[in-house]
Amino acid sequence: LLETTTIMRHFFITLYLLGISLFSSAQQEEKAALLITHYGSSDPQTRALTLDVVTREAQEAFPQFTVREAYISPIVRKRLAKEGVYKDSPTDALLKLRAEGYRTIYVQSTTLIEGSEMTSVRRDADKLRPFFKEIKVGNPLLYSVEDCEKVIGILTAEQPEKKEDIVYVGHGNQLPSTATYAMLDFMMKAHGLKNF
């Protein structure tokens, strides 16, 4: 379990760092923010080990930005609200940042593929773009073949025992982007990685 948690942590951190190119052009004197969007999790332990770590490490990696987080899933936000935990939607987070005087926003989602959640994040940013000087939205982790190559390198850095297999599970959808998971599997097999 600890090894899986470590792999997941590195996985999400890598997702975040792959979006770094978006943020390199920000002007330091301007009030800018980084909005990390997560699908969300209603499990406190999962949040603490993954999503909270990504948000915290984003703030450490980019101290020049105010870092905020938002949860994409309305179902997760409703469940959390019943427990007294309140998370903003991407739209709400953007509106709050605007009200606080932020004019440049960089949005990076922790979603894996260009699925319905990522489409939702892009739509929210587009809807509010006229109210900001600039909103840039980063791509999901598995956006290009090059991204998949980098992720394969990270996921396979520690090889399983010969009689062990590692299974990665991604949440698909009805969009063609679900084929990204099949592409990742094919690429792993092409690299001779039979235990993944």
Regions found by a protein language model. Name each.
Residues 3-4, 21, 133, 189:
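A general, composition-driven signal for non-globular sequence regions
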Residues 12, 16-25:
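Hydrophobic h-region of N-terminal signal peptides that target proteins for export
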Residues 3-11:
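Positively charged n-region of N-terminal signal peptides that target proteins for export
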Residues 27-196:
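Active-site-proximal alpha-helix that buttresses catalytic centers in soluble enzyme cores
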